[in-house]
Amino acid sequence: CDLYPERVDSAQAILVRRGFPEAASYSGEEGWKQLCERDDIDLVYIVTPWLQHVPMAVYAMEQGKHVAVEVPAATSLEECWQLVNTAEKTQRHCMMLENCVYDFFELTTLNMARQGLFGDILHVEGSYIHDLDAFWDYYQDSWRLKFNQKHRGDVYATHGLGPACQVLDIHRGDKMNYLVSMDTKSVNGLKLAEEKLGATEFANADQTLTMIK
């Protein structure tokens, strides 16, 4: 399922070249709804621009499907509650797929921590330092650049935070109480927004640092 039919055709061609039959396919603005409405699937995997995650997840659960959604699953507290309430009402699972908690290094570290090799863990650090200049306007209608133009902070902090939370047993006996977040001014983001969008303001910083107790 993809917004653009030519991308669906490209995926179908890969299946055929490898000796597999073509899969059922959907495209266009509403194609994803048709997929969710099928009665022969159990789970919908959502890999779309961020602002589409919650509407698609909610609709899929309302159609009786479990949901696996890429990060960030939601972009506001209200959207988080919308996912929780819909999952509870429909009795469907809704899981955010934070790929970094499944990497070899992170899983190895978690295993070592649970075996007590580090003793009592008092402090952890996680980060996701990634130069995004080449990606800001790569996506359809520059949606990623536009999101960061209007929003400030770690928009998907779980790349670094997810593995750290597992090591600390967050929500498995411990919890976060408060945080302090600091950021730099925007230099690269503002420059790219000026070049690509003609914008004179850019909300998100080049670097954000958050301390959590």
Question: How does the language model describe each region?
Answer:
Residues 12-16, 84-87, 113, 168:
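Conserved hydrophobic residues forming the short capping helix/wall of the S-adenosyl-L-methionine
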